[in-house]
A protein has these predicted regions:
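Short, small/polar-rich loop/turn modules that mediate ligand/substrate recognition or access, typified
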Residues: 29-33, 84-87
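Catalytic loop of short-chain dehydrogenase/reductase
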Residues: 1-16, 21-29, 41, 95
Length: 109
């Protein structure tokens, strides 16, 4: 996940998901498996214009919005594979690889 001081809510939610998933998996095993999904641009939020949302997903390497069915498929994958625990799967069209935050745009990274 891309840690960035420009989007605190994103950074806190993704690192929180990651840490909660890992520590819960350690704490609850072997009886309970814990995995997480870190989605990218899937659904436009209430404060976002359609134009801004489109700009967001077009800035990903795959240049596409995440389909909700892909997230459902990931849940199904985790359910069907009993040897997986403590993993977070980024279904984000590659957003976490090169999210175009100001530090990237200005060439600071």
């Amino acid at each position: 996940f891309k840690l960035t001081p420009y989007f605190f809510s994103y950074t806190i939610s993704k690192t929180g998901l990651y840490t909660l998933t890992k520590t819960s998996a350690m704490s609850l095993s072997p009886n309970i498996r814990v995995n997480g999904i870190a989605p990218g641009p899937t659904i436009k939020n209430k404060r976002q214009s359609e134009k801004h949302f489109k700009k967001q997903y077009l800035a990903t390497p795959l240049k596409q919005q995440v389909d909700v069915n892909e997230i459902c498929n990931a849940v199904d994958f985790f359910i069907k594979n009993s040897s997986i625990t403590g993993q977070v799967l980024a279904i984000d069209s590659g957003q976490s690889l090169n999210w175009q935050t100001p530090d990237i745009i200005k060439g600071k990274e």
